[in-house]
UniProtKB/Swiss-Prot annotation:
Its EC number is 2.3.2.6. One of its GO terms (biological process) is protein catabolic process. This is Leucyl/phenylalanyl-tRNA--protein transferase. Functions in the N-end rule pathway of protein degradation where it conjugates Leu, Phe and, less efficiently, Met from aminoacyl-tRNAs to the N-termini of proteins containing an N-terminal arginine or lysine. The gene is aat. Its main location: cytoplasm. NCBIfam families: aat (TIGR00667). It catalyses: N-terminal L-lysyl-[protein] + L-leucyl-tRNA(Leu) = N-terminal L-leucyl-L-lysyl-[protein] + tRNA(Leu) + H(+); N-terminal L-arginyl-[protein] + L-leucyl-tRNA(Leu) = N-terminal L-leucyl-L-arginyl-[protein] + tRNA(Leu) + H(+); L-phenylalanyl-tRNA(Phe) + an N-terminal L-alpha-aminoacyl-[protein] = an N-terminal L-phenylalanyl-L-alpha-aminoacyl-[protein] + tRNA(Phe). It comes from Azotobacter vinelandii (strain DJ / ATCC BAA-1303).
Length: 226
């Protein structure tokens, strides 16, 4: 049975109550306050819904993740990285990255990154929890991604690319940096060919929950300004 969240409570139902069809739908309602979003990620769920729908909260089983040590850099991507045709930065323009991620896609109608969603994640960025990766080419933003860093876990949200390999360069650079900072897992939420080509794989939700339990409150050496 689907749980309806109340605005005066930040609690979420146990993950095992999530529906099998559609896979992982856990709850509906609530709001996108910073406090609720932080609680959601710590609990193991995330918001995803289309404009005009109520807020839907998901915790799919299995969960797609990438372990930094398992990053797969193909020969062609390695060549692009060596050529240094792109420049990568962190937290230089979060607003521009999330705006670009909300842009139209050839394979989808509409966007789930609504103005309300953008405002919510920008608040998390102001609090030092949400971070962006920017990929530049000749001074123009051509790719990037954003997500949340909590403890030793990074929760990826969305990425975009306006040039061949731009998002892959940004993601690979982020993963290398996260591994250096002591992060143990990147939450990719749902499988895509793009992420799987970079080394992402699916694990049981119970295993994902174990990582939440053991690593959310451990420190990292992250320095997003460096």
């Amino acid at each position: 049975m689907l749980t309806c969240l109340q605005r005066d409570s930040l609690s979420f139902p146990p993950l095992e109550r999530a529906l099998h069809q559609p896979n992982g739908l856990l709850a509906v309602g609530g709001d996108l306050s910073a406090e609720r979003l932080i609680q959601a990620y710590r609990h193991g769920c995330f918001p995803w819904y289309q404009a005009g729908q109520p807020i839907l909260w998901w915790s799919p089983d299995p969960r797609t993740v990438l372990f930094p040590r398992e990053l797969h850099v193909s020969r062609s991507l390695r060549k692009v990285l060596r050529q240094e045709r792109f420049q990568v930065s962190f937290d230089r323009d979060f607003a521009a990255v999330i705006q670009a991620c909300a842009g139209p896609r050839d394979y989808a109608d509409g966007t789930w990154i609504t103005p309300e969603m953008r405002k919510a994640y920008q608040e998390l960025h102001h609090r030092g929890i949400a971070h962006s990766v920017e990929v530049w080419q000749n001074g123009v933003l051509v790719g990037g991604l954003y997500g949340l860093a909590i403890g030793q876990l990074f929760f990826g949200e969305s990425m975009f690319s306006h040039a061949d390999n731009a998002s892959k360069v940004g993601f690979a650079t982020l993963v290398e940096r996260l591994e250096r900072w002591g992060f143990v897992l990147i939450d990719c939420q749902m499988p895509t060919q793009h992420l799987q080509s970079l080394g992402a794989r699916s694990i049981p939700r119970t295993e994902f929950s174990d990582y939440l339990m053991h690593h959310l409150d451990l420190p990292s050496t992250a320095d997003w300004i460096a």
